[in-house]
């Protein structure tokens, strides 16, 4: 009787590289395969051109060497959602495992887009093709005679997020990275509380769960709260400003929809500008997830971004820009506007709205400090933290625990303090560290004491 957990990436760090593998007897299933958002900035536009070895060296992708002896035993890989810290390394790593890869439609379409870019730069001698399979929430897939996958819908800050469940002869293994409980989400899925409670009654062997915000003694607010914040701030800014620029996560389709809808009500034409805005926005439009107002434009190539901003600069009060660069990352649209590299001139009459939070890593904090300082020097009006998180707070985590009643818990997707904070919560709920709650770090494995 063997159930082993391999902590491949995301264990002991908050910024990405999320990748976990579970071995059940002689069969292995991989969960997620993400990149480090800040470490990948080292390569800027050349991420696709960089070799796996280079990316591992700077810790931009998971070091999956712990799985090398087990590649032939890998029977499936599952992608929980489409954030880059969960799918960004798929083109670099998963082709080596020669196994089917499952995800929801939005997730799979984004992986396909990344694969198309990867193929352009791949070594001709290397076969990087991956067998991708689209699933719907509630689907079940029998992957081997012993193992079955189930996909439970859950809310998060990106459409079409699921909690993958691996059903084994020893009980269910639930992978809850990432989630929040939001009953008012409009785009994407709502949590299936009924199925989660039912699963708890059937028997959950192991819960692998994110821990990013478990130290915060809150229930994470609904995205409906962010919609009201966006509406309130943009109406205020519209009265006081000529130009309005909003920067947010390109993958946060529901937030982009809310910003665009408010701009439309204010009589401002919408421009989405930036490479990742184009990637996520176009796929979301194709799948019917994003419905931009009439006349809205997406500019994602250097020449179209330049032309679009030039036009908006001449009639600032008629436009609202939704742009990349909320982390201050070099090469994104907002930092380039601030540095005068793009033809949109900021003045004291303009407003910049950050519908985002700063991802807690040293590089991001430094980049944001530089960006904020430059904006202040230009006299621009700034509105920060017009945002709610997509990650579970302490009380969301407590609810998940009480619904699932897992026998064992492994906190993931967090730095050491976050993992410890989850262990503290679990202790409150009657669990004990090193008996049924296990803190793991990258490159380690755990055999469950069955």
Pin down the residues of each PLM region.
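Short, conserved loop/helix-junction motifs that constitute active-site signature segments
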Residues: 93-97, 200-202, 342-349, 402-404, ...
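Short beta->alpha junction loops
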Residues: 385-392
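His/Asp/Glu-rich metal-coordinating catalytic cores
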Residues: 2-76, 85-265, 269-275, 279-304
């Amino acid at each position: 009787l063997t159930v082993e957990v391999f902590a491949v990436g995301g264990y002991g760090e908050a910024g990405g590289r999320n990748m976990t593998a579970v071995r059940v007897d002689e069969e292995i299933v991989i969960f997620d395969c993400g990149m480090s958002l800040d470490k990948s900035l080292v390569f800027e536009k050349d991420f696709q051109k960089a070799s796996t070895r280079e990316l591992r060296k700077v810790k931009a992708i998971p070091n999956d060497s712990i799985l090398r002896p087990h590649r032939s035993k890998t029977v499936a890989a599952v992608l929980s959602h489409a954030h880059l810290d969960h799918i960004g390394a798929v083109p670099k790593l998963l082709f080596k495992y020669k196994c089917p890869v499952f995800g929801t439609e939005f997730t799979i379409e984004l992986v396909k887009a990344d694969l198309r870019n990867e193929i352009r730069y791949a070594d001709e001698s290397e076969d990087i093709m991956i067998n991708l399979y689209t699933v719907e929430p509630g689907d079940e897939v029998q992957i081997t005679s012993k193992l079955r996958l189930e996909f439970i819908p859950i809310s998060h800050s990106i459409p079409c997020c699921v909690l993958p469940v691996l059903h084994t002869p020893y009980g269910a293994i639930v992978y809850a990275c990432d989630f929040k409980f939001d009953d008012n989400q409009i785009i994407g899925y709502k949590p299936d509380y009924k199925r989660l409670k039912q699963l708890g009654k059937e028997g959950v062997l192991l819960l692998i769960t994110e821990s990013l915000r478990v130290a915060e003694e809150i229930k994470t607010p609904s995205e409906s709260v962010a919609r009201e914040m966006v509406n309130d701030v943009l109406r205020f800014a519209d009265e006081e400003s000529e130009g309005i620029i909003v920067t947010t996560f390109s993958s946060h389709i529901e937030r982009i929809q809310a910003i665009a809808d408010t701009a439309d009500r204010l009589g401002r034409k919408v421009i989405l500008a930036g490479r990742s805005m184009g990637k996520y926005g176009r796929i979301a439009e194709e799948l019917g997830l994003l419905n931009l107002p009439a006349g809205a434009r997406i500019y994602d190539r250097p020449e179209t971004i330049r032309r679009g901003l030039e036009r908006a600069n001449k009639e600032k009060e008629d436009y609202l820009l939704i742009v990349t660069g909320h982390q201050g990352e070099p090469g994104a649209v907002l930092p380039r506007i601030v540095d005068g590299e793009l033809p949109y001139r900021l003045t004291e009459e303009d407003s910049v709205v950050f519908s985002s939070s700063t991802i807690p890593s040293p590089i991001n904090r430094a980049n944001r400090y530089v960006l904020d300082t430059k904006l202040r020097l230009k006299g621009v009006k700034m509105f920060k933290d017009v945002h709610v998180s997509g990650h579970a707070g302490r009380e969301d985590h407590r609810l998940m625990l009480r619904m699932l009643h897992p026998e064992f818990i492994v906190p993931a997707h967090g730095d050491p303090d976050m993992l410890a904070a989850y262990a503290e919560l679990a202790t409150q709920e009657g669990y004990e560290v090193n008996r049924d709650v296990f803190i793991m770090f990258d490159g380690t494995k755990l055999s469950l004491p069955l």
